[in-house]
Curated annotation (Swiss-Prot):
Segments for region (Interaction with target base in tRNA): 98-100
Residues where ATP binds: 12-19, 38, 127
Keyword Methyltransferase among UniProt keywords: no
Site location (Interaction with tRNA): 128, 344
Gene Ontology, cellular component aspect: cytoplasm
Protein name: tRNA-specific 2-thiouridylase MnmA
Gene Ontology MF: a single term: tRNA binding
Localisation per UniProt entry: Cytoplasm
NCBIfam families: PRK00143.1 (NF001138), trmU (TIGR00420)
Active site: 103, 200
Disulfide bonds: 103-200
GO biological process: tRNA wobble position uridine thiolation
Length: 373
């Protein structure tokens, strides 16, 4: 039997049930476990309560229960510089960013990993639903979590081989329901705590209200692609491609009673384009360009391959052909795709393995850009 007592694992503990069970399982497996709470955002809720303080209390309670030391580390500056500035720049450019992908790459598996090394860590661990598997050459492959509904490899797709070599995902083989059961059986303080939602480390604030604190909204015209004026929009940054709600126009404007959707943006003229029908022609595309292309292991500078891909979290995989040229790629779809959104991640899979991915720059229909951006 392996003696894990000399292997130190530093666990990123958020105060939620997933990271609590992560620490518990590692402790039960005999590892030398240390818990670390990351404070990445200066946050208070509508009642003036600092939610980070409440979460840290939960971390302390769980760490005391399972008998591990714990620390708090402040990454507010790193988060602002490496994640939040990027987040704002993307919205200024009319795109819809995915800050969770950048947060994992820059904070949880860079700033936190570096800090863990100063504590003498051999590995870091988090409560993500993903799996790592070593091959005979010592290379680490990242596999989807066993719970399809919770798999988080989409958000981990920018991690490097070096980061994965130092990472453990103890929940990867479990269903979420099993994680709750483990927490309840152990009587953990977080066993019944609800899952957090919302933007990475910003929580459940009203998004429109939150964004307006940092970016001035500029109202403009809402139009159909054939030039019909449909009224005023509140600011392009508040809308994403394929969005249905919040437009303030109903079926009465159309004649066929189909709902209205955002189909494009023109940043230079501050126009929001809308169209009727879930599969409106302006929402459909057959390829995309992506940048910041990254693979979890070494790949050639230029190559072409077939795989499946996700263009947003929680969507079925689609078959694609990928033409890689350095850190850029053209991704050609086997079937037309709906609402491909600049700023979101495209993530590549080979069966259960997550190969990596990139950030969507533009969608194309028959070679023509189709987002009006």
């Amino acid at each position: 039997m392996t003696d894990n007592s000399k292997i130190r694992v530093v666990v990123g503990m958020s105060g939620g049930v997933d990271s609590s069970v992560t620490a518990l399982l590692l402790k039960e497996q005999g590892y030398d476990v240390i818990g670390v709470f990351m404070k990445n955002w200066d946050d208070t809720d509508e009642f003036g309560v600092c939610t980070a303080t409440e979460d840290y209390k939960d971390v302390a309670a769980v760490a005391d229960q399972i008998g591990i030391p714990y620390y708090s580390v402040n990454f507010e500056k790193e988060y602002w510089d490496r994640v939040f500035e990027y987040f704002l720049a993307e919205y200024r450019a009319g795109r819809t960013p995915n800050p969770d992908v950048m947060c994992n790459k820059e904070i949880k598996f860079k700033a936190f990993l570096d800090y863990a090394m100063t504590l003498g860590a051999d590995y870091v661990a988090t409560g993500h639903y993903a799996q790592v598997k070593r091959d005979e050459n010592g290379k680490v492959h990242m596999l989807r979590g066993a719970d399809n509904g919770k798999d988080q490899t989409y958000f981990l797709s920018q991690l490097s081989q070096e980061q994965l070599q130092k990472t453990l995902f103890p929940l990867g083989h479990l269903q979420k329901s099993e994680v709750r059961e483990i927490a309840e059986r152990a009587g953990l303080a977080t066993a019944k705590k609800k899952d957090s939602t919302g933007i990475c480390f910003i929580g459940e604030k009203n998004f429109k209200q939150f964004l307006s604190q940092y970016l001035p909204a500029q109202k403009g015209r809402m139009m159909t692609i054939d030039g019909r004026d449909m009224g005023e929009h509140a600011g392009l940054m508040y809308y994403t491609i394929g969005q249905r709600g919040g437009l303030g126009i109903g079926g009465q404007h159309g004649g066929d009673n189909q709902p209205w959707f955002v189909v494009g943006k023109d940043l230079s003229q501050n126009i929001l384009y809308v169209g009727q029908g879930f599969y409106h022609e302006a929402l459909m595309s057959n390829s995309l360009d992506a940048s910041v292309i990254h693979f979890t292991r070494e790949m050639p500078e230029e190559f072409t391959f077939e795989c499946t891909a996700k263009f947003r979290y929680r969507q079925p995989d689609s078959h694609v052909t990928v033409h890689v040229r350095g850190d850029k790629a053209e991704v050609v779809f086997a079937e037309p795709q709906r609402a491909i959104t600049p700023g979101q991640a495209v993530v590549f899979y080979d069966g259960k393995e997550c190969l990596g991915g990139g950030m969507i720059d533009m969608a194309y229909k028959n070679g023509q850009p189709c987002q009006y951006i």
